[in-house]
Amino acid sequence: MVAITAALVKELRERTAAGMMECKKALVEANGDIELAIDNMRKSGQAKAAKKAGRIAAEGIILAKVSADGKYGVILELNCETDFVAKDAGFKAFGEEVINAALAEKIADIDVLKAKFEEQRANLVAKIGENINIRRVAVLEGDILGTYLHGARIGVMVAATGADEELVKHIAMHIAASKPEYVKPDDVPAEVVAREHQIQLDIAIESGKPREIAEKMVEGRMRKFTGEVSLTGQNFVMDPSKTVGDLLKENNADVVNFIRFEVGEGIEKVETDFAAEVAAMSKQS
């Protein structure tokens, strides 16, 4: 039996907006498997579509650059421990040096990039007094590349065809705001579709609908689901009356691929439970 910790219950509450007791019960029934707990809660109507895991906790900056010929681009995440250091001139200069090297030498392997700058990173850590991590790097190649940085916390790079610079920037801004996971509805992996289909079917059947009617209901829900998680299926943030797919079609353009980085995605700082800490100190005294 997996121990159901307060941290696990807290994460499930944040992702489902359900009550504490419901979350604890769901985790017990799922033997601590948070994804299974979410699926079961959705089927029973205790939770709507859950938020994705990936609480933003780490600090740092996102950098993105495209080569002079516009055909090759690099996007990079550089982490530190505090927002104060993220704004430090020396930290930013280090990030610029790293991404310039990644672009010039076409370094797409994070381990190679880390090794190249390890000595400088260690020196900067000693100077600043915080841990610094070249966390991830990704590259795109294409006919037309565009980037968008929202502050220094969100970065997007888009590879497109048939689009001008302004359109690519608008698409990148949309991606920054709407967080699509795939380019087109057809790109959603079969296992993701199958999982969502089963959840929606169970919900429909448990609501009392005959299986045949439930199947037809789910067809519509699945079209909505794949549209919502894909770029071309989403309503365009600057004009919600049309989808991004409509916008691209109007301009005889297409998006081949995109990358979206947000500072600290998937990283959690260790959070101290103050009450537990006080209790522990009391026992020691």
Swiss-Prot record:
InterPro entries in UniProt: EF-Ts_dimer_sf, Transl_elong_EFTs/EF1B, Transl_elong_EFTs/EF1B_dimer, Transl_elong_Ts_CS, UBA-like_sf
GO molecular function: translation elongation factor activity
GO cellular component, one term: cytoplasm
SUPFAM superfamilies: Elongation factor Ts (EF-Ts), dimerisation domain, UBA-like
Domain of life where this protein originates: Bacteria
Cellular localization per UniProt: Cytoplasm
Keyword terms: Cytoplasm, Elongation factor, Protein biosynthesis
Pfam families referenced in this protein's UniProt entry, alphabetically: EF_TS
Keyword Protein biosynthesis attributed: yes
Region described as Involved in Mg(2+) ion dislocation from EF-Tu: 82-85
Gene Ontology BP term (one): translational elongation
Record bears the keyword Protein biosynthesis: yes
Role: Associates with the EF-Tu.GDP complex and induces the exchange of GDP to GTP. It remains bound to the aminoacyl-tRNA.EF-Tu.GTP complex up to the GTP hydrolysis stage on the ribosome.
NCBIfam families, A to Z: tsf
HAMAP family given in the database record: EF_Ts
Family listed: Belongs to the EF-Ts family.
Full protein name: Elongation factor Ts
